[in-house]
Amino acid sequence: MLVAGAIIVKAVTETNTHGARAIGYAVPGPGGKAMPQLVVVPAHAARRPPLLVFLHGKGQDQSSSATSAFYAALAAAGPEAPDVVFPYGGEDSYWHNRETGDWGRYVMDGVIPAAIKRLHADSHRVAIAGLSMGGFGAYDLARLHPGRFCGVGADSAALWRQGGETATGAFDNGEDFERHNVIEAAQSSTNPYPGARLWLDVGTEDPFRPADTSLADALRTKGVAVSFHVWPGGHDESYWNSHWAAVLRFFTKALAACR
């Protein structure tokens, strides 16, 4: 809890929140360890707000994406903007159940219910997104829980088309990769994301661009609509901060349309 408190002080004192409230707390994670969370409530929050779950990238933490650009974009999204929860997911969990812990279960059974209860959020209007490692996690978790989310999205999703291409530590072994191969799932399933509006963006110089494009192509081949964007830039904070406004506009509309 002290860690969460430190996070909220940093978020509020060093960043212009545009009237939003940043709140830190902890929920039990894999192995019962307390995992810090950062939730952000817009200045004009609804009584039963929608919820956006945003998963961080490798080597980041729950406060990494709560930048000035994020807060400005949240304010610009207007009165229907969602509350946002940024959970901590470890250094390189890749947000799935594996030998190091049940990271996927932690999100679904810990992070989301705790945020809904604390924020009095609408349990039916929930979206999930993330960047890099978190972008993979968002598409993987939504695939494994079809119908749970109104929107699914990723910035610069850390995806690979073959197990031999993956980053060290991303998966336990080849079988683990195959169980969580979202591109193959999109190619073999009619629609792994029923009822969800899909977002995916990637930079022109991002090494994940080919794999992200493969995911978008696989979805479109199946007749699944996906808002896919390739914008100038690489796999870095400058790129991600440049597109917060577009991302939050998309999810605000997706959640408003979900009833």
Annotate each language-model stretch with its function.
Residues 3-259:
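Non-catalytic cap/lid and distal C-terminal segments of serine-dependent acyl enzymes
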